[in-house]
């Protein structure tokens, strides 16, 4: 089975947020970067499926040269090869633009299964995987908690979806298919020294992206949430103050 995993590089979660001068994105010049956590679970699930059925795992990521960091990490964890969509503009691209680029890169590979994280830690749209499946003309399923391979030779998979209110749904799907993986589906593995050394010899295919491609989505402004503190003194007798406090909590704060 050929499995492709789409991985995004995001700013580390402990990095203090700074907005750039344009107020259209964060100032990431001096930031640290890491693999998007939901994508790390997607990669781990792909590696486990490969261990069950054989085949290969292809890691794919879009962005500037620094994206090679997460691709090498994926190779060190066990991916067989990688595809780098080299473009400075794709790092903060909207879901449609990114999905179009990823779909174009993966279409020639004809993977049996494409895995993505449920959403990215930076933008959190949760749309890229679904849009990519539509562009490729393949079935998809979201918020996956478990994947079972078909051992009867029918080319099907059975997946467990997380629904609202603690409910789950089992779905049988034909391949090729795309799945968006929920965080916590498995236990992440760490790259071993042997894996790190082996990753240096694995192929990373660079795919040039048209620099004139523009996002269809325009970000008006990014800003740090403004915190406002207001102090109100409630006067009157204890019973009057208590009655007024309950009214404020119920009608204004809406917490009771």
Language-model features: where?
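N-terminal glycine-rich FAD/FM-binding segment characteristic of electron-transfer flavoproteins
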Residues: 1-256
């Amino acid at each position: 089975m050929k499995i492709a995993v789409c991985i995004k590089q995001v700013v580390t979660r402990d990095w203090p947020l700074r907005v750039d001068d344009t107020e259209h994105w964060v100032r990431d010049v001096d930031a640290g970067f890491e693999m998007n956590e939901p994508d790390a679970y997607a990669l781990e699930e792909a590696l486990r499926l490969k261990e069950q059925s054989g085949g290969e795992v292809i890691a794919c990521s879009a962005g500037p040269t620094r994206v090679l960091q997460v691709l090498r990490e994926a190779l060190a964890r066990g991916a067989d090869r990688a595809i780098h969509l080299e473009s400075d503009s794709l790092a903060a691209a909207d879901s449609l633009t990114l999905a179009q680029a990823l779909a174009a890169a993966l279409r020639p590979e004809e993977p049996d299964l494409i895995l993505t994280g449920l959403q990215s830690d930076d933008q959190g749209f949760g749309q890229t995987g679904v849009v990519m499946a539509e562009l490729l003309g393949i079935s998809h399923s979201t918020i996956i908690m478990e994947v079972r391979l078909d051992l009867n030779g029918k080319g099907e998979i059975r997946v467990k979806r997380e629904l609202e209110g603690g409910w789950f749904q089992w779905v049988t799907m034909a391949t090729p298919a795309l799945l968006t993986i929920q965080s916590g589906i498995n236990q992440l593995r760490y790259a071993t020294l042997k894996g790190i050394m082996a990753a240096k010899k694995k192929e990373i295919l660079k795919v040039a992206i048209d620099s004139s491609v523009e996002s269809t989505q325009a970000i008006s402004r990014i800003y740090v949430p403004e915190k406002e503190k207001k102090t109100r003194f409630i006067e009157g007798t204890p019973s009057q103050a208590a009655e007024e406090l309950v009214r404020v909590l119920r009608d204004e704060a809406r917490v009771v």
